[in-house]
């Protein structure tokens, strides 16, 4: 009987020890899988632990990183967008389209935040160096909010990300709630030295116009295309929009002067209702060509002010 009791006792001890080891292994497994997510490129990314050395390859993400309480050890150089004060002294690794890989690798990052369309060519090299990469896209308003959510998950500050997204929604609603119910017919033209294209819902200006409830007369031509597509003068005359928005690199005053010359030299322009009424607006590149990020509500208000100046008079 004593032997049976002793054997039973030993069995209990062994079982407890095994259970203890099993729990420990489970904890390690959980600890080794800090975060799993799908990034903007549709890649499944798993972080074994919370990243400590994050590098951003685009200045567009800096304000969003700051908003969720994140820190970085390296960043792309910003020529136009504002850099948060706390990040100005952070080492730079080159312009967004000309990243210095030697400088980047020298920072020994454990996570790189890359642009979906700008930096996908770097992903294989970074991953071969055991560096995690999350590709982000923040052209549309929904993409900005998704990026904020991802960054909140990366830094473990989901509550801050949620609050920031709620604030963005409120700021946009504060503008759209003041607008008349009518649907303005608009077109968004992107002008370069070689061509003029029209922009759709996946461009910044196109997304903003959608948020404001405007009707893009070029929507049919853009169906199934990317954010821009060529558009003929004949089609523009036929659609005859109420308002024309123009995006272009350069100073708005210079662009407006160039447009006046074009209008003068091409009678077809002068047949357009928008041109006759003086409703051609050049949109600032810092809000409509360069990703506005958390300034998206500012872009929404800017476009709304051009269309309905009386609604937003006296700084409303």
PLM region spans:
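A short, structured surface patch at a secondary-structure boundary
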Residues: 53-107, 111-116, 214-217
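Proline-aspartate-enriched helix->loop->beta-strand connector
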Residues: 93, 101-114, 131, 232-246
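Alpha-helical, coiled-coil/dimerization segments enriched in small aliphatic residues
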Residues: 79-81, 198-227
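Structured C-terminal subdomain patch of bacterial secreted/periplasmic proteins
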Residues: 145-146, 153, 162, 176, ...
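Short helix-initiation/N-cap motifs at beta->coil->alpha
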Residues: 39-42, 90-102, 223-233
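Extracytoplasmic ligand-binding site segments that recognize negatively charged/polar headgroups
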Residues: 119-121, 137-150, 185-208, 252-254
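Flexible loop/hinge segments that line or gate small-molecule binding clefts
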Residues: 83-86, 118-150, 154, 281
